[in-house]
């Protein structure tokens, strides 16, 4: 009797184990092998997972794989986790994937998890060499015409954690039309001289969180585009790169308002810019940008640490004949400390057509060669409190000052000069 009971218990354990594993789909079971293209195997595994009425996990084991591009599309019947523990390589030849497509694209998903220790290698070195120098990239050789590493399009209630995006030929990650998507413990890496390799760019998305993430690129570590609302960037290490940016904005008539942005507890090291808002002059966009907060930011040798630039025109792509029409309001820079690579630690260049309202500098304590940095301001009178450089701008909305000034300087920016892209 005891023997029979033991057999039954063992059988039930095995049955339960098998049932628990039934939702795990290893691509090797679908023909996916290291050192070969896994497009078909991954597509087959995805189709099976997407049709499942219970949660499923797709696993790409350790090893090096090739992939010429894939679109993983929903809606699916239940949550899906894609666990990547290997290295997946994009085509080195940018012409394999046409236009501005995304190499690894997710569409119309709810409850997606992308996890693992894996690396998505965009193999961008050939593009970087072809397009140098960066200042020439606005023409036909621009890498804006080649593919990005990732696209998350209309992906909701989802998380990306643990994986690495390496050497994308264009932006690393595009987030578009998403709601409640989180990047946590994500790594993005590309050479500091790799143009247009923004880390995470988002647009027309709500409740996006970028947490505890390391980003080093040749462009903005994070760029927040139009239609972005309730965005949190927290615990991000940025460098090399062009900093943490809202914008650029105003270039197109179809743009939507930006509001509710919080950038907090971030560290920037040797970046070309720090925390920044940028809008185009002489452009048709008329949106509003409000409730933007940068707080508890640490900088080490950062050029242009604090910037509002409403005369943003990289590589002279436009004119400053007419001012920006983008209205900026309720913007704060609080507890920003560290060292600057430029004497001017704060540059606030607002629009003469719609001057900035409600800008606050609170404990902005930056040093250049051991001395406090200065401030340059146009069309804005910020409220300055604590230790911070004080600036004034005649004709702008009134603001009070209760600061312990680190320095004070009022100036008009030199013609034709704009902070680095």
UniProtKB/Swiss-Prot annotation:
Glycosylation: residue positions: 156, 180, 265
Tissue distribution: Pollen specific.
Catalytic activity: (1,4-alpha-D-galacturonosyl)n+m + H2O = (1,4-alpha-D-galacturonosyl)n + (1,4-alpha-D-galacturonosyl)m
InterPro entries (alphabetical): Glyco_hydro_28 (IPR000743), PbH1 (IPR006626), Pectin_lyas_fold (IPR012334), Pectin_lyase_fold/virulence (IPR011050)
Leader sequence segment: 1-20
GO MF terms, alphabetically ordered: polygalacturonase activity
Subcellular location: Secreted; Secreted, Cell wall
Similarity-based family: Belongs to the glycosyl hydrolase 28 family.
Protein name: Polygalacturonase
Organism of derivation: Medicago sativa
């Amino acid at each position: 009797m005891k023997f029979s009971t033991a057999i039954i218990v063992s059988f039930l354990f095995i049955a339960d184990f098998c049932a628990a594993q039934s939702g795990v789909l290893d691509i090797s079971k679908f023909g996916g092998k290291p050192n070969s293209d896994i497009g078909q195997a991954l597509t087959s595994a995805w189709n099976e997972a997407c049709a499942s009425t219970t949660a499923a996990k797709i696993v790409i084991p350790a090893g090096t794989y090739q992939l010429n591009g894939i679109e993983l599309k929903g809606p699916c019947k239940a949550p899906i986790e894609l666990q990547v523990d290997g290295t997946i390589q994009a085509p080195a030849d940018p012409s394999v994937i046409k236009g501005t497509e995304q190499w690894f694209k997710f569409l119309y998903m709810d409850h997606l998890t992308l996890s693992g220790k894996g690396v998505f290698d965009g193999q961008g070195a050939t593009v970087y060499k072809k397009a140098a120098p960066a200042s020439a990239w606005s023409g036909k050789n621009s890498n804006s015409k080649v593919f990005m590493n990732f696209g998350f399009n209309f992906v909701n209630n989802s998380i990306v954690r643990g994986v690495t995006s390496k050497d994308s030929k264009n932006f690393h990650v595009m987030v578009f039309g998403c709601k409640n998507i989180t990047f946590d413990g994500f790594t993005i890496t590309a050479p500091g001289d790799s143009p247009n390799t923004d880390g995470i760019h988002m647009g027309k998305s709500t409740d996006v969180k970028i947490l505890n993430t390391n980003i080093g690129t040749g462009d903005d570590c994070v760029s927040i585009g139009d239609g972005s609302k309730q965005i949190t960037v927290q615990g991000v290490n940025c460098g090399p790169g062009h900093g943490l940016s809202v914008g650029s904005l105003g270039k197109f008539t179809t743009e939507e308002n930006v509001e509710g942005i919080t950038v907090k507890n971030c560290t920037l090291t040797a970046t070309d810019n720090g925390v920044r808002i940028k809008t185009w002059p002489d452009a048709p966009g008329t949106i509003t940008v409000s409730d933007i907060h940068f707080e508890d930011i640490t900088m080490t040798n950062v050029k242009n640490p604090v910037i509002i630039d409403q005369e943003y025109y990289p590589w002279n792509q436009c004119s400053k004949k007419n001012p920006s029409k983008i209205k900026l309001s309720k913007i704060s820079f609080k507890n920003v400390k560290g060292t600057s690579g430029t004497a001017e630690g704060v540059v606030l260049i607002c629009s003469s057509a719609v001057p900035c309202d409600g800008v606050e500098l609170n404990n902005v304590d930056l040093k250049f060669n051991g001395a406090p940095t200065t401030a340059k301001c146009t069309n804005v009178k910020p409220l300055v409190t604590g230790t911070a450089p004080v600036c004034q701008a005649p004709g702008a909305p009134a603001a009070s000052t209760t600061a312990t000034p680190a320095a004070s300087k009022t100036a008009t920016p030199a013609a034709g000069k704009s902070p680095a892209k």
